[in-house]
Amino acid sequence: MLAAKNILNRSSLSSSFRIATRLQSTKVQGSVIGIDLGTTNSAVAIMEGKVPKIIENAEGSRTTPSVVAFTKEGERLVGIPAKRQAVVNPENTLFATKRLIGRRFEDAEVQRDIKQVPYKIVKHSNGDAWVEARGQTYSPAQIGGFVLNKMKETAEAYLGKPVKNAVVTVPAYFNDSQRQATKDAGQIVGLNVLRVVNEPTAAALAYGLEKSDSKVVAVFDLGGGTFDISILDIDNGVFEVKSTNGDTHLGGEDFDIYLLREIVSRFKTETGIDLENDRMAIQRIREAAEKAKIELSSTVSTEINLPFITADASGPKHINMKFSRAQFETLTAPLVKRTVDPVKKALKDAGLSTSDISEVLLVGGMSRMPKVVETVKSLFGKDPSKAVNPDEAVAIGAAVQGAVLSGEVTDVLLLDVTPLSLGIETLGGVFTRLIPRNTTIPTKKSQIFSTAAAGQTSVEIRVFQGERELVRDNKLIGNFTLAGIPPAPKGVPQIEVTFDIDADGIINVSARDKATNKDSSITVAGSSGLSENEIEQMVNDAEKFKSQDEARKQAIETANKADQLANDTENSLKEFEGKVDKAEAQKVRDQITSLKELVARVQGGEEVNAEELKTKTEELQTSSMKLFEQLYKNDSNNNNNNNNGNNAESDETKQ
């Protein structure tokens, strides 16, 4: 455990800085493709001169389903061929696996997905959620890799040459582990992922490439599996993200599931047959639900016809149901409502009101839903822009960023942000922030800390992510130990802790003992990170418990100071024992004992009266000052008496 020790505030060390170099300074050789690795569909684009182009796949489509299937013949299918055979091979057809990237098997979202997909989600030996097909287990990153490879092959077929470098997009609210897993997916198939770019930021790049005027743009990105809202300031080629928010488990897949459940429920009511465990039937209904959802964006009603969905003793059963747009909107209203709070929080974090927003861009297939468009219009007080293609903007933006990295496009600077605050645990379980949420990245920040006990030769650095004042209310994302610190009194060693976040949002934390230059570090990439509920809860709780957290933090900090005062006073009493008034010394000892008991209660997590702690600290401070002032006076008087005696002897000698 570390004891926070801001030595003269260490402003030169603890100020963060933005690496705002023009990105073309790190040029790469050859073409850099841009890939939108989506939950439902993926796309690939390339820059041709100054014009970005979406590349059609082998089937002639501009987007490719993010679906991977394994046939009984041992063949692996990706994209449209995989999706076509899903009904006859549901348990070996993997889709929406992006939602599993970087997640632990025990995560609530994973447990929910287990009940909603026909394939097996299993627990890997490291605790992560993996998938199983044909008796073989795969990491979600591997499945993502197969889709990335399909995008790579699509680009190579068009360009007529091998492709090695890519920019891949991720949801803005992806945590460190999910970003790292996305880079791993590229590496698996031999792609050098030069940059991981947030999806709404990429869409803004696509929108603002040829625009020189200054605008504040909101990107509302509701895709197949995730929702992001980002506020950007676009000014003459500089794209600066002001804030971001979102939900990593909200998208078109959820709308499909809501409609699927309604169909299954109606069918059960009509026939008494529960289709929930019939994987083939559920897959047919899932595909029909997706198709109906899409149709209801352009028509006011649709019909779902699925003949021979099942059979019982009386014969075959069919599904024949009608759904109106109004019914679908009522059914999915809770999902649409979940987009509202993140928008409000993003505006608040950016310090802006809706009147400050120049344009609202709609991105992601679900943003076509009329109710979503209506909600966005209501939130921002203006019609959203149709300047970008919701399905293609992200891949185009990734291609723009790729062209920046290769030097084909100049004078474009992208400044993104980290979505949640980062810091470490300090004495008393306090969350000490080093990098606040919505800090522009890349960024680096250092701060000096010290030991919490005398003779401490190692410290454990525990890295947390969140918005609460105490670590117990935030998310542990990594920890490591710095050993080999020379034994010294409590608070003497100077340990410099540095957070370094790269342009991909991946975190490196290091600690260095300034006396010996020994250091230790960790790249925070092994944890499964935060669920969307945890992120939303963190921000809500941070507001709800702000005063309570602040009071608790103040109590801990006061207790730490009180403990230091008690120890210092106790040591001084021992040093000057016999030179101070015994009664006064005992009074001070009693105050030390009383104060230490109160401090122990605070450090044990007990709620104590902050005023009582403050009063007892001040009383000890006053008593100890009086005692040692008297000691100083006594010493001064003794010195004066000695000097007078010496002067008298000197006078006698002269006579």
UniProtKB/Swiss-Prot annotation:
GO terms for cellular component: cytosol; mitochondrial inner membrane; mitochondrial intermembrane space; mitochondrial matrix. Keywords: ATP-binding, Chaperone, Hydrolase, Mitochondrion, Nucleotide-binding, Phosphoprotein, Stress response, Transit peptide. Gene3D superfamilies: 1.20.1270.10, 3.30.420.40, Actin, Chain A, domain 4, Substrate Binding Domain Of DNAk, Chain A, domain 1. Residues 629-655 are annotated as: Disordered. Residues 637-647 have a biased composition (Low complexity). It is found in: Mitochondrion matrix. Changing D651G: In strain: D273-10B. Essential component of the PAM complex, a complex required for the translocation of transit peptide-containing proteins from the inner membrane into the mitochondrial matrix in an ATP-dependent manner. Constitutes the ATP-driven core of the motor and binds the precursor preprotein. Required for the import of the processed frataxin homolog YFH1 into the mitochondrion. Acts as a non-catalytic component of endonuclease SceI (endo.SceI), which cleaves specifically at multiple sites on mitochondrial DNA and produces double-stranded breaks. SSC1 confers broader sequence specificity, greater stability, and higher activity on the catalytic subunit. Belongs to the heat shock protein 70 family. This is Import motor subunit, mitochondrial.
